[in-house]
Amino acid sequence: MAAPCAEDPSLERHFKGHRDAVTCVDFSINTKQLASGSMDSCLMVWHMKPQSRAYRFTGHKDAVTCVNFSPSGHLLASGSRDKTVRIWVPNVKGESTVFRAHTATVRSVHFCSDGQSFVTASDDKTVKVWATHRQKFLFSLSQHINWVRCAKFSPDGRLIVSASDDKTVKLWDKSSRECVHSYCEHGGFVTYVDFHPSGTCIAAAGMDNTVKVWDVRTHRLLQHYQLHSAAVNGLSFHPSGNYLITASSDSTLKILDLMEGRLLYTLHGHQGPATTVAFSRTGEYFASGGSDEQVMVWKSNFDIVDHGEVTKVPRPPATLASSMGNLPEVDFPVPPGRGRSVESVQSQPQEPVSVPQTLTSTLEHIVGQLDVLTQTVSILEQRLTLTEDKLKQCLENQQLIMQRATP
């Protein structure tokens, strides 16, 4: 039986209903619904099932800047230039709860993987964490010195990453509320950031037309792509962790192969800046939005044939190590074209001929898992030390109390 062949991405359908630029898109967990927000102050929930009417939610008093489905799919969060966050029930009634979240535009909202909390980012320079069901503010992270464009939880909920107009990406520990590291390599405002599905890496998009990928354990810059001719407005990891898609003001979407560090496709669909992009939870589809007021849904196709069985577990992108000198700053040539064309750039990966790709990938995965184990052991040791210190302090306090009580 012949193996299935990967195909080019294809435009499945497009939704028209917004009356101004589309700012954000997100799929529900079961891919039955797609939410989008717009500068027209409305939130739309589109049904992937043909002939189904969309829901138009009105409640925000200004542009809707961000949207995110809860992990269960039963709730939908949106943020706005009206400084509020609304939690909606995505059904025909469109009921919502309002959070007076920030003192300036809310740029980003994202649920934790357990759905119990969500994080927001704002032009008031803060990142805030909220309890979903108790509708309660929990804490604020405030070391950025300019607008915060985006904030996301790590897959395990332990870390938060934020991107700002202060040209930094900051990594935070949720439990200690401390900034773990600041990444300062961007040459302009950082517009978007997200975690790799494995939780070991982050990717950030910038106004300097670049996309950068860092390891959150070593804080090393792993990959640097300069493929767009204008600002990169959004990005999304494929659930396998092998691909990354970007949306840019140059009107294109670009799909990157992270394992080989190369450009796979350039997609022309939007007339004007592509403002947002997101994969579905399975990776079978991705959606994009633009200043042309359109929401487009694409079928991935290219992920049918993947990099072997090891892709069942998401793993971080290959490091540039030896090829650091030639992959960063490389602007891959893209053939000219317009409309619904899909263009593939053939670029041979620079890998040792003697080592099979599957073996290399497997070894990378093993090394990644060892790093995670090492980090886990280190955390356990720290907790044990902390417990011992507290126990020692308790014993000393008890002895002091007994001494004072003795006549």
UniProtKB/Swiss-Prot annotation:
Coiled-coil region list: 369-397
Segment forming the signal sequence: none
InterPro entries assigned to the protein according to its UniProt record, in alphabetical order: G-protein_beta_WD-40_rep, WD40/YVTN_repeat-like_dom_sf, WD40_repeat_CS, WD40_repeat_dom_sf, WD40_rpt, WDR55_POC1
Record key words, sorted: Cell projection, Ciliopathy, Cilium biogenesis/degradation, Coiled coil, Cytoplasm, Cytoskeleton, Disease variant, Dwarfism, Hypotrichosis, Repeat, WD repeat
One GO biological process term: spermatogenesis
WD repeat placement: 17-56, 59-98, 101-140, 143-182, 185-224, 227-266, 269-308
Subunit structure: Interacts with POC1B.
Protein name as annotated: POC1 centriolar protein homolog A
Keyword Electron transport: no
Protein role: Plays an important role in centriole assembly and/or stability and ciliogenesis. Involved in early steps of centriole duplication, as well as in the later steps of centriole length control. Acts in concert with POC1B to ensure centriole integrity and proper mitotic spindle formation.
One of the Pfam families matching this protein, by short name: WD40
GO CC field: centriole; centrosome; ciliary basal body; cytoplasm; spindle pole
This protein's record includes keyword Aminoacyl-tRNA synthetase: no
Family: Belongs to the WD repeat POC1 family.
Subcellular compartments: Cytoplasm, Cytoskeleton, Microtubule organizing center, Centrosome; Cytoplasm, Cytoskeleton, Microtubule organizing center, Centrosome, Centriole; Cytoplasm, Cytoskeleton, Cilium basal body; Cytoplasm, Cytoskeleton, Spindle pole
